Amino acid sequence: MKIFFAILLILAVCSMAIWTVNGTPFEVRCATDADCARKCPGNPPCRNGFCACT
């Protein structure tokens, strides 16, 4: 059973790494462009209260 959970954890980490490279699958709220620089890869602008991560 521990091996099963270890495999699930590895898959979850890998899928999150892929999402980070391709852009987040969810909306990231921001107040300034500096917030997006910390939360998204690259340096996306803050538009209408959300980061343009994709």
UniProtKB/Swiss-Prot annotation:
Disulfide bonds join C30-C46, C36-C51, C40-C53. Residues 1-23 form the signal peptide. One of its GO terms (cellular component) is extracellular region. Has the structural arrangement of an alpha-helix connected to a beta-sheet by disulfide bonds (CSalpha/beta). Potassium channels inhibitor. Belongs to the short scorpion toxin superfamily. Potassium channel inhibitor family. Alpha-KTx 14 subfamily. This is Potassium channel toxin alpha-KTx 14.x.
